[in-house]
């Protein structure tokens, strides 16, 4: 053990800011703990292996322990030993034999090495026992950083919500097999920031890259024992530190992250982080002591009121952060502010967001944390997206978050999947979901963008697998099929998995286009899962959280069909962006506007007439039209905006349906801009109002009314502009599969090309 250094080595320093702050002359160390009796600062060598000094923090102010170390510099590796009672039955688990990470550390060095010494109790015995082994040599260390970075001309894109299209991806998986990324940069922040990668994302037309968790995290020992890893990263142990495994040069991971953000911003792309403030990697009472548990277990975690030895588990991970404690709320908001200001990210997706607003008696829409995000000068201008559920009582809260927040909408996912699968009785629900789910979100002045629509996400089937598998195939996860959802609302179109049957292949391709077009043409904010635009597969694995291999990695070896699908997605995105009526801020009501003599939306039966009330829930009704009247786009002085009138027709029947094109004020002809059934998916044919259009079974068609008025020049230009833009090719990766990709694909369990 290194010698204990007198307190006099440290001056009193400051309780704020929390964490380790270098000012060029020394480092201020500050750590919150309401229940500790003493805190020791432990300094380590440059490799983070040898403990050099142990110094007691000299001051305690407002429940914060602090001290200033002159001549300390950036690059200093450190940790803490926190003294206090070890009384699990009272909620206290202090153990100074365990080195703990600073919750505010901006960087980590090294990796957790699973050993009995990292547990506060004697592993294999009762958690009431006290373990005296030193954990330091098995622990990663916190590191002091110099945050200096030259941003240059970088500017935040500030994409308006109505133009936002989210693109969910994984830093490692997106470029691990990318042929244009140098091998040493693949799977890193630097790889994601490469020009070839950024150019592809930009040309696709999405606006905001949503990254799966990049906070420092831990892989559970049971996964390592199986030769697996925590690939997704939903197991955070540091909310300020980017995980060094995503860096080409781990010692400078924070700078590499900033460089990636700058490159994406230069292209006008936003960066959204998936953040996990609901639990930590320390698990339940049988978990390790890595940070929060050993610093102040009673403050950081929600414990059972009648027996604080045990943790409330509303997350399914073993513990739940205590968002009723002011200091925990402060830590989370400080973390968000750090990423928004110092790291310049543009928004956040909150995993299990209900947790963040839980109080003693359940979810509270007026919770201080939710309100503080909206009032904070740095956070109020970012995009705030909640995953509005957890597994606790009353945890499902879709539509329950306050104004200013957007929410993942799983009702959209399930309804759209069921409709295109051919489930009966989905017509009414489908109309609601196409209208931004006003039944959930149209309250308190919220706008339609509050509904984040998705068909697939990281958790579940990819789009290709959704139309190729009826059942999950998670054998590679080593849990005997117990993991992952069993009800996926999927349909394999006749054969489970890959097939050579041309009819089934054609149907699957059309179903993918139907699902993507529905997602991108619905009101609300669309989110695409990266790789869905060219048919990425996970071989039927719907829970690939532990698969850091070709099951999860994006395969950039394209064939003609993959390129064709990506071109289709780009064209539909251009349609959405070209016509504001496809991305309204206001919710659709269908009510008659006497001032404008119009309804903003009409729902049409194949006869071309309004759907009658009695027929909304007709179990045989699987074809209908959504008519969006451009005259309803009124300004504050009740003057119609210059916008298109659009007709979206969806047919989930297996057979052709004759659909009568309605007569509408403002034009006498309908131009077909999109048809998911024909080879290039765009037609540009013109049909007269009143004419009958044959819509193929299981297909979607979009029409725009040809404007007849001389005042509609802008609309004609928008239509022509879309036609011209649609001819530009998308820059795809080289089609040849490199040796590493071939090797990865052949080695990954269960991977077979369709």
Feature-to-residue mapping (PLM):
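Conserved, mostly hydrophobic/aromatic
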Residues: 31, 80, 169, 201, ...
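A generic secondary-structure signal for well-formed alpha-helical elements
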Residues: 76, 84-86, 173-174, 178, ...
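Core domains of carbohydrate- and sulfate-ester-processing enzymes
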Residues: 82-150, 221-229, 234-235, 267, ...
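Structural recognition of the beta-strand scaffold that forms the well-ordered cores
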Residues: 165-168, 208-211, 238-240, 347-349, ...
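Conserved alpha/beta catalytic core and glycan-binding cleft of carbohydrate-active enzymes
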Residues: 344, 359, 365-530, 534-535, ...
């Amino acid at each position: 053990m290194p010698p204990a250094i007198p307190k006099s080595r440290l001056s009193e320093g400051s309780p704020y800011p929390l964490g380790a702050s270098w000012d060029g002359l020394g480092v201020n160390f500050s750590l919150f703990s309401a229940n500790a009796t003493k805190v020791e600062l432990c300094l380590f060598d440059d490799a983070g292996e040898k403990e050099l000094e142990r110094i007691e923090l000299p001051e305690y102010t407002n429940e914060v322990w602090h001290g200033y170390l002159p001549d300390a510099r950036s690059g200093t590796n450190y940790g803490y030993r926190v003294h206090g009672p070890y009384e699990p039955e009272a909620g206290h688990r202090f153990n100074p034999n365990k080195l703990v990470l600073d919750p505010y550390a901006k960087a980590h060095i090294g990796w957790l090495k699973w050993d009995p010494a990292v547990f506060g109790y004697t592993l294999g015995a009762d958690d009431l026992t006290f373990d005296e082994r030193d954990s330091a040599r098995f622990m990663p260390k916190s590191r002091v950083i110099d945050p200096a970075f030259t941003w240059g001309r970088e500017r935040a894109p500030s994409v308006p919500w109505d133009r936002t299209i989210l693109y969910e991806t994984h830093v490692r998986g997106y470029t691990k097999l990318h042929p244009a990324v140098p091998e040493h940069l693949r799977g890193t922040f630097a790889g994601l920031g490469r020009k070839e990668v950024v150019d592809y994302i930009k040309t696709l037309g999405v606006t905001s890259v949503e990254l799966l968790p990049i906070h420092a995290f831990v892989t559970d020992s049971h996964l390592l024992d199986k030769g697996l890893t925590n690939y997704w990263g939903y197991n955070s142990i540091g909310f300020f530190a980017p995980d060094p495994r995503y860096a080409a040069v781990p010692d400078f991971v924070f700078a590499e992250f900033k460089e990636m953000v700058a490159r994406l911003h230069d292209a006008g792309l936003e960066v959204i982080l998936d953040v996990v403030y609901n639990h930590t990697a320390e698990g339940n009472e049988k978990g390790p002591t890595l940070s929060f548990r050993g610093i102040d277990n009673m403050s950081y975690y929600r414990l059972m009121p009648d027996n604080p030895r045990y943790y409330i588990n509303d997350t399914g991970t073993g513990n739940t952060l205590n968002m009723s404690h002011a200091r925990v709320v402060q830590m989370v908001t400080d973390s968000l502010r750090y990423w928004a200001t110092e790291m310049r990210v543009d928004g956040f997706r909150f995993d299990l967001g209900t947790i963040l607003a839980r109080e003693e008696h359940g979810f509270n829409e007026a919770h201080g944390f939710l309100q503080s995000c909206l009032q904070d000068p740095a956070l109020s201008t970012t995009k705030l997206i909640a995953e509005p559920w957890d597994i606790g009582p009353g945890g499902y809260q879709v539509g329950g978050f306050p104004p200013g927040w957007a929410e993942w909408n799983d009702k959209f996912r399930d309804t759209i999947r069921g409709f295109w699968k051919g489930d009966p009785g989905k017509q009414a629900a489908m109309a609601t979901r196409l209208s931004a789910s006003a039944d959930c979100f149209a309250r308190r002045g919220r706008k339609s963008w509050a509904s984040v629509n998705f068909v697939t996400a990281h958790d579940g089937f990819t789009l290709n697998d959704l139309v190729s598998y009826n059942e999950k195939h998670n054998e590679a996860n080593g849990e005997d099929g117990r993991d992952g959802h069993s009800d996926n609302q999927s349909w394999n179109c006749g054969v489970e998995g890959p097939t050579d049957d041309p009819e089934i292949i054609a149907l699957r391709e059309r179903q993918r286009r139907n699902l993507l077009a529905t997602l991108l043409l619905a009101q609300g904010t669309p989110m695409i899962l990266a790789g869905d635009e060219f048919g990425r597969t996970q071989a039927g694995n719907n829970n690939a959280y532990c698969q850091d291999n070709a099951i999860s990695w994006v395969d950039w070896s394209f064939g003609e069909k993959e390129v064709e699908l990506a071109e289709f997605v780009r064209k539909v995105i251009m349609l959405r962006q070209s016509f504001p009526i496809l991305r309204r801020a206001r919710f659709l009501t269908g009510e008659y506007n006497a001032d404008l003599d119009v309804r903003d939306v009409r729902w049409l039966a194949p006869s071309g007439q309004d759907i009658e009330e009695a027929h909304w829930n007709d179990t045989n009704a699987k074809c209908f039209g959504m008519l969006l009247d451009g005259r309803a786009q009124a300004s504050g002085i009740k003057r119609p905006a210059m916008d298109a009138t659009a007709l979206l027709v969806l047919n989930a029947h297996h057979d052709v349906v004759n659909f009568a094109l309605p007569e509408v004020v403002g034009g006498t002809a309908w131009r077909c801009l999109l048809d998911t059934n024909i080879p290039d998916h765009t037609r540009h044919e013109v049909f007269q109002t009143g004419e009958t259009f044959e819509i193929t079974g299981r297909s979607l068609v979009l029409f725009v009314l040809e404007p007849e008025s001389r005042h509609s020049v802008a609309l004609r230009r928008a239509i022509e502009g879309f036609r011209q833009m649609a001819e530009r090719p998308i820059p795809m990766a080289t089609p040849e599969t490199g040796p590493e990709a071939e090797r990865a694909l052949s080695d990954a369990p269960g991977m077979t090309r369709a």
